[in-house]
C-alpha cells in the first residue's frame, strides 16, 4: 500500500499555510481583474475598490481601466467567462411546444438544448440537495400496481408519438420522486450506498463521452486510466507491480465468473476449443455462506450446481479449513478433479472474513486455484487499521474487488484482478478482425477488449479514478475507518439492551451488524419453535412499516435455521452516529406494539 505520509517538498515559508487557499490566491492585478470580470459589474467594481485602498495611484488607475474596458466590450467572444455566461444564461422557455427533434443536432437547436439541459441540471441538483437533507424521506413507497397504473402526470407506458420536452422533464422529476434515495444518510439497505459528488461528476462526463472500452483508438484516456488503476489495486493486494492483469466488469458476480473461467483455462486450456467434454469431471468449492454468484457461475459455465461443493462454516460464518480439506479428499476419492476454491473476504450477511492463509496452504498442497471474493471487504485493504483481516490475500490467484461497495464509488464499478498476466487474454480472446487489427499505428496491447467476455463495455473507470484523485488513498482510508467505527458504535449501543438480541457473540469484523428486535410480547420468553416462529415475522413487519413511512431502510433475512433478523450494513460516508441513533429509535417505535 502506498505511503500516506504527506509530501515534505513544501517550503518552510508555506508550512503553516492552507494549501487549498494558497494555490488559489491570485498574485497579479491582471488575475484579480479577471476575477472581477467574471462577477457582476457592481461586485467587480467593489473588488477593484478593495484593492485600490492598498496600492499606488498608477496601479489603481490601471486596474479600474482594465475592468471597465472588459465590461464595456461588445464582443462576448473576447473572454471565455463572458461567452460562457451569455450562452448558458437561463431564459424563459416554453417546453410544451418543444420536442426532442428541436434539440441538437437540429439546425439552430443549441439554445433549446442549453435551456433543456439547464432544467435537467436543476432537477438533479434539487435531488442531490434533498438526498442529504435528513428531513426528506428515503423513499415515497408505492406498490407496483400503483406505479403501473400510472400516477398523476407520470405514466410508464410507451407512446407511438413523441411527447413534449415539458412532459420529459416531468418524467425526469417523477422518476427520481418515486425511486429510492440510496445516497440518503439513513439508507442502510444494501452494500452499495452513498452519493459521492466527485463520482457523480465523473459519471456525467462518462455519459457525455459515450464511448466503449474495447480499444485504445476510441477510448485512449479511459483505457490508460483503467490500466493505471488496476495496477495500483494489484499493488495494494500485495502482488508485484510488474505482473498481473485485470479488467473492470459489470459487477461482482461477473468478476467471480471471470475467476472460474481463468482457473479452468489455466489448468485445462483445451476447454476453450473443445468444451467441457474434453476435460475431467471438475468440482469447485465455496463456503456455505458465500455469495450465490459462485453457484450461478457453476450453472452458467457448464459445471452444474451439484459440482459446486459447499464448505461448512463456524458460528461466525467463516470457512472451517478442516472441512475444506476433507471435502477435497472426498471428491478425489469419487473420481472428481478439484481445481478451484472461493474464499470470501466480507460475506454478504455476517461480514465474515475467511481464513485466507490456512485456505492458501491447502490450495498449495492440492494445487487448487485460490480466488478471494473481496467484493465487499476489499475496501479494507485501503485501511492500515483493518487490512490485517485480509491477511494472505497476496497468495490468491485472483481477487474480486468492488469499489462501488465499501469505497462508495457510484454503481457500477467492479474489478477482477488476476495474478498471472495473459490468462484473461488467452481465455477470452477471439481476435475479431473488425476491432482488434494487429497492424494499427499504436501498441495494440492497449486494446484490452479481447480480455473481456463482453464486446461492448461501459466506462466504469473514470468516476473511480476521479474520486481517487480527489480523495487520495488516505481519503478512502479515513472514509472506511469511519464506517467501521459506526458499526462498532451500533454494536455497543444495542448489545446489552433487552429489546435487542445479537445473532452471534462478539464485535463485528466488518460493518455488518446482525440482530433481532425483540418486541415486548417476546421478551423473557424461553427459546422454542413457537418463539422462533413469532420472531421470524417481526423483522418483515417492521421493514414494511419502515418503507410505508419512508424514514429509513435496513435489510433483513434468515440464515440457516435462524429466524429473520436485521442485517445492518454501513458504507455511506454521509452517515453519522445520530443516524444510527435514529435507526434504533425507529425500529423501537415501529415494533413496540408487535
Curated annotation (Swiss-Prot):
Noted disease association is:
Developmental and epileptic encephalopathy 89: A form of epileptic encephalopathy, a heterogeneous group of early-onset epilepsies characterized by refractory seizures, neurodevelopmental impairment, and poor prognosis. Development is normal prior to seizure onset, after which cognitive and motor delays become apparent.
According to its UniProt entry, the protein's GO biological process terms are: chemical synaptic transmission; gamma-aminobutyrate shunt; gamma-aminobutyric acid biosynthetic process; glutamate catabolic process; locomotory exploration behavior; social behavior
* Domain of life from the UniProt record: Eukaryota
User: What is the protein name for this chain?
Assistant: Glutamate decarboxylase 1
Name a GO molecular-function annotation. glutamate decarboxylase activity
Whom does it interact with, and what assembly results? Homodimer.
Q: Which major enzyme category is it?
A: lyase
Where are the Phosphoserine modifications? 78
Amino acid at each position: 500500500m502506498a505511503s500516506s505520509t504527506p509530501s515534505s517538498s513544501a517550503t518552510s515559508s508555506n508550512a503553516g499555510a492552507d494549501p487549498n487557499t494558497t494555490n488559489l490566491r491570485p498574485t497579479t492585478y491582471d488575475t484579480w481583474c479577471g476575477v472581477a470580470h467574471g462577477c457582476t459589474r457592481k461586485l467587480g467594481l467593489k473588488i477593484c475598490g478593495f484593492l485600490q485602498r492598498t496600492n499606488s495611484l498608477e496601479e489603481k488607475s490601471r486596474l479600474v481601466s482594465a475592468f471597465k474596458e472588459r465590461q464595456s466590450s461588445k464582443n462576448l467572444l473576447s473572454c471565455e467567462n463572458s461567452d460562457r455566461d451569455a450562452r448558458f444564461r437561463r431564459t424563459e422557455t416554453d417546453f410544451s411546444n418543444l420536442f426532442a427533434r428541436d434539440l441538437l443536432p437540429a439546425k439552430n437547436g443549441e439554445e433549446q438544448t442549453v435551456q433543456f439541459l439547464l432544467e435537467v441540471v436543476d432537477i438533479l441538483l434539487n435531488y442531490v440537495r434533498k438526498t442529504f437533507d435528513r428531513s426528506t424521506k428515503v423513499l415515497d413507497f408505492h406498490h407496483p400496481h400503483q406505479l403501473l397504473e400510472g400516477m398523476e402526470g407520470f405514466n410508464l407506458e410507451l407512446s407511438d408519438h413523441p411527447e413534449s420536452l415539458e412532459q420529459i422533464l416531468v418524467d425526469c422529476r417523477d422518476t427520481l420522486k418515486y425511486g429510492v434515495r440510496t445516497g440518503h444518510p439513513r439508507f442502510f439497505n444494501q452494500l452499495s450506498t452513498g452519493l459521492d459528488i466527485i463520482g457523480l461528476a465523473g459519471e456525467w462526463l462518462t455519459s457525455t463521452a459515450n464511448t466503449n472500452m474495447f480499444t485504445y483508438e476510441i477510448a485512449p484516456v479511459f483505457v490508460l486510466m483503467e490500466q493505471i488503476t488496476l495496477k495500483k489495486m494489484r499493488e495494494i493486494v500485495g502482488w508485484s507491480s510488474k505482473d498481473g492483469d485485470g479488467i473492470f466488469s459489470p459487477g461482482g458476480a461477473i468478476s467471480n465468473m471471470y475467476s472460474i473461467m481463468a482457473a479452468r483455462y489455466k489448468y485445462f486450456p483445451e476447454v476453450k476449443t473443445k468444451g467441457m467434454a474434453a476435460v475431467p469431471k471438475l468440482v469447485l468449492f465455496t463456503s456455505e455462506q458465500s455469495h450465490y454468484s459462485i453457484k450461478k457461475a457453476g450453472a452458467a459455465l457448464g459445471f452444474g450446481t451439484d459440482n459446486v461443493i459447499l464448505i461448512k462454516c463456524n458460528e461466525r460464518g467463516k470457512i472451517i479449513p478442516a472441512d475444506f480439506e476433507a471435502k477435497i479428499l472426498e471428491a478425489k476419492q469419487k473420481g472428481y478433479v478439484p481445481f478451484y476454491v472461493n474464499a470470501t473476504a466480507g460475506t454478504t450477511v455476517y461480514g465474515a472474513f475467511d481464513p485466507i492463509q490456512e485456505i492458501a496452504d491447502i490450495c498449495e498442497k492440492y494445487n487448487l486455484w485460490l480466488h478471494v471474493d473481496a467484493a465487499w471487504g476489499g475496501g479494507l485493504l485501503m485501511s492500515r487499521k483493518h487490512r490485517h483481516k485480509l491477511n494472505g490475500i497476496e497468495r490468491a490467484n485472483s481477487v474480486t474487488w468492488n469499489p462501488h461497495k465499501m469505497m462508495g464509488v457510484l454503481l457500477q464499478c467492479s474489478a477482477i484482478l488476476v495474478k498471472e498476466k495473459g490468462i484473461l487474454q488467452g481465455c477470452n480472446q477471439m481476435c475479431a478482425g473488425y476491432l482488434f487489427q494487429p497492424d494499427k499505428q499504436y501498441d495494440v496491447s492497449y486494446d484490452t477488449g479481447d480480455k473481456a467476455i463482453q464486446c461492448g463495455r461501459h466506462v466504469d473507470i473514470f468516476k473511480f479514478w476521479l474520486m481517487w484523485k480527489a480523495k487520495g488513498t488516505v481519503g478512502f482510508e479515513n472514509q472506511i475507518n469511519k464506517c467501521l467505527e459506526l458499526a462498532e458504535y451500533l454494536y455497543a449501543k444495542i448489545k446489552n439492551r433487552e429489546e435487542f438480541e445479537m445473532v452471534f457473540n462478539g464485535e463485528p469484523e466488518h460493518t455488518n451488524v446482525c440482530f433481532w428486535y425483540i418486541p415486548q410480547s417476546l421478551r423473557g420468553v424461553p427459546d422454542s419453535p413457537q418463539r422462533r416462529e413469532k420472531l421470524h415475522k417481526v423483522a418483515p413487519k417492521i421493514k414494511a412499516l419502515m418503507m410505508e413511512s419512508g424514514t429509513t431502510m435496513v435489510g433483513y433475512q434468515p440464515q440457516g435455521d435462524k429466524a429473520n433478523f436485521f442485517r445492518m450494513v454501513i458504507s455511506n460516508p454521509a452517515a453519522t452516529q445520530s443516524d444510527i441513533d435514529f435507526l434504533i429509535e425507529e425500529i423501537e417505535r415501529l415494533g413496540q406494539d408487535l
